[in-house]
Amino acid sequence: MCIRDSLIVDRGDKREFCAGSIAKIFEEIGGKVIYFGKPYSPVYNLSAKISNKKVLCIGDNMNTDIKGANNQKFDNLLITSGIHKNELNIGSIDKLEEKYGVKVNYIQTKLKW
């Protein structure tokens, strides 16, 4: 079971392989992987059951976070300081959306609790 489909993740200044990379290799050698998490619908269905209010999906990955939100028709917030930071500059959100086949609703540089 793979609960994080992302291939890479940024941890501070370091870019590291994520669980999705291991799952992909396992599939390539014939293994069966069950995915749970973004962008797959079970995690979003669970979110919708928890609250009947509007859901906002927040993340930095176009392939998982934003794609999953789009698939479920939920609003999303792209954190631009994440894994796509080197692909982004002023006015490039449209190009990034086209490249990944997704639609971003809101953007923010960082998320701080």
Task: Kindly label every feature range from the protein language model.
Residues 4-113:
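Asp-based, Mg2+/Mn2+-dependent phosphohydrolase catalytic module
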